[in-house]
Amino acid sequence: MVRTMPIERVRNIGIAAHIDAGKTTTTERILFYSGIVHKMGEVHYGTAVTDWMAQERERGITITAAAISTKWLDHQINIIDTPGHVDFTIEVERSMRVLDGIIAVFCSVGGVQSQSETVWRQADRYQVPRMAFINKMDRTGANFFKVYEQIRDRLRANAVPIQIPIGSENEFTGIVDLVAMKALIYNDDQGTDIQETEIPADVEKLAQEYRLKLVESVAETDDALTEKYLEGEELTAEEIRKALRLATISGTVVPILCGSAFKNKGIQLLLNAVVDYLPAPQEVPAIQGTLPNGELDVRPADDEAPLASLAFKIMSDPYGRLTFLRVYSGVLAKGSYILNSTKDKKERISRLIVLKADDRIEVDELRAGDLGAVVGLKDTLTGDTICDKDNPIILESLYVPEPVISVAVEPKTKQDIDKLSQALQALSDEDPTFRVSVDPETNQTVIAGMGELHLEILVDRMLREYKVKANVGKPQVAYRETIRQQIQAEGKFIRQSGGKGQYGHVVIELEPGDPGSGFEFVSKIVGGTVPKEFISPAEQGMKEACEAGVLAGYPLIDVKATLVDGSYHDVDSSEMAFKIAGSMAIKEGVIKASPVLLEPMMKVEVEVPEDFIGNIIGDLNSRRGQIEGQGLETGMAKVMAKVPLAEMFGYATDMRSKTQGRGVFSMEFSNYEEVPHNVAETIISKSRGYV
């Protein structure tokens, strides 16, 4: 088959923001104006197309990243609508990994909020070009210019308005296009009767001021334009568009647009900007991966290149198990056999589909730059590479944060026992931040995730989708352990009891790893002191030993083990013996390497009336909080702090009583930090049953 849409006309974009900034409504309007849906869906009525899970429609929030394909101005736009709630950060993270551009939506009243900063950091991590849409210009208190300044100051972005609003709140009637220097006035409620006119006199001066900022910003990106500008010549609209496109794709400029998705204003102009300024797949750097020989290679966004694609999401639905893929290069065809190079397993592509929310459209192939889903892959999980079996490559996987909260779950009846394990397996396949383990002492099943809402939604899904009734315990903090010193340790496993014995011996250097690195293993064996076939079992033993630390039995993270020496026996050595030796080396080494307890720290942002600021700061300090910043805006005080999760249970109730119900707060995971000695002693004693 030939390509129906040239790759230069494809846009893979995400819509991301803080909760309640209006992302899903913006997506709905995009689908309406591009003709995918013929009736506008509303989040608050539970009719949004991209919110297809029952919980999403009930709660009015987006939980999973829904992928949808639409067309605009003879371009194919693949859109991912991502959640804004911090508990579902992994959904945003995996979307960023496979997108070429982002629309960051900001509320014109709330402005830059904590999750806005998280989304921005995630986009920075994957170097995703972006533009900003300042939404809800019709709301009381809307202030486009305040939010513009916040984007520049708090996000340190070179943000440049390419539009300014005409009026705000009830008086928001149109938009000035600063590139074309024309006004667009909305004459109806549907946003379809748009009148292009000269710029009204009351905003003419402001428009000239911001047009000058735009021209200066784009002129700086191109020597020829700089010269033209310095000589006093006028830049044409076409020259500005071309330079702005290159500057947006390179990440040096962030164009700012405005509108009101709910009131149907500004969406067509936003779609035009996606086509004009966000990149096609071949305009972003080619994806890099590792070949079997360890060398790095790239796969260009070209149908003729060998197939390379990344599984970025697993989803169970009535149609079966869907594996969402981004195809970076080559063609993925129905009926073909492919290689999961991450697991070194071959799989068959039985069916391929693209999504329009509830509608699944079967296709024969996905080409370079496409987003779609495969039905029925058995071994593929999130972050795995799917590639051509004759040209294997492993792409960089996804960054998955450690879970911060856990609860014990148990089936209510005997009939629920098998169903519970099946449900937990399916849900953990879908969501890499959802971990399932069994407490070795109590034999209870423990589930861990990114927050209370995250676990609440998953327990709810067990009941709805898998018909499992479960009792859920109290939330527990997901502590971790690590080491502070570099040491050498050995593990020697010898067993002689007549007949064939067991012999495995390894020597390792154990040292602290980089934050967020988990467990890292390196082999520096030379001369065959440990045969090649025993290195992998030794590594596996070490990994398994890291599942329970020596202080309080919490998982060991951010450690690096280097295999430097060892010995073997021609007859008695086996994979099992080296696996046990690896485990022994870690356990012995950790005791000597100054082990410490780590706890999850949360980034907390509290907004309260000015009068209550003293109470709030005092309360956060009493919770072992570190105050990181304060601000004042229109009678409301904002406090930014880092607080241990262990101290934040029940905070919502306490804060409401301290502020007479007038305060709001948001909380998201920041990082793991060492627990103070006196607190750690209590936690360790409790884990050992002394308290």
Curated annotation (Swiss-Prot):
GO terms for biological process: ribosome disassembly. GO terms for molecular function: GTP binding; GTPase activity; translation elongation factor activity. Keywords: Cytoplasm, Elongation factor, GTP-binding, Nucleotide-binding, Protein biosynthesis. The keyword Transport does not apply. CDD domains: EF-G, EFG_III, EFG_mtEFG1_IV, EFG_mtEFG_C, EFG_mtEFG_II. The keyword 4Fe-4S does not apply. GO terms for cellular component: cytoplasm. Residues 8-282 form the tr-type G domain. GTP binds at residues 17-24, 81-85, 135-138. It is found in: Cytoplasm. HAMAP family: EF_G_EF_2_B (MF_00054_B). Belongs to the TRAFAC class translation factor GTPase superfamily. Classic translation factor GTPase family. EF-G/EF-2 subfamily. Catalyzes the GTP-dependent ribosomal translocation step during translation elongation. During this step, the ribosome changes from the pre-translocational (PRE) to the post-translocational (POST) state as the newly formed A-site-bound peptidyl-tRNA and P-site-bound deacylated tRNA move to the P and E sites, respectively. Catalyzes the coordinated movement of the two tRNA molecules, the mRNA and conformational changes in the ribosome. This is Elongation factor G 1.
